[in-house]
Amino acid sequence: MKEKLVIGNWKMNKSFGEADDLLNDIADKLQEYQLRTGVVMCPPYLYLELATDLADENDFSAGAQNCSEFDNGAYTGEISAEMLSEIGIEFCIVG
């Protein structure tokens, strides 16, 4: 059976400090509960490193909000799946 996931898409919300506080609050709550689902947090790109650092120490994963259909090239502002993988991102919202 496939693992069920709860995925939080933050859209374009939170400052860096607010993102840090929220991720820490979520990590604390996840330690209190024995969930039978995986949890993935998808903050804005600027906060992915913060999310991956906290995810490594806690019971959730970090995910991206989008990725490019291209592997590389002159696509300003795009981020490839390979780039995301290099920083430890295993999940991405597509669509």
Task: Give names to the regions the model predicted.
Residues M1-I79:
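Conserved N-terminal beta1-alpha1 strand-loop-helix module at the mouth
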Residues E90:
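Short acidic/polar active-site loop segments enriched in Thr and Asp
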Residues V94:
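Short beta-strand and adjacent tight-turn residues that come in two discontinuous sequence segments
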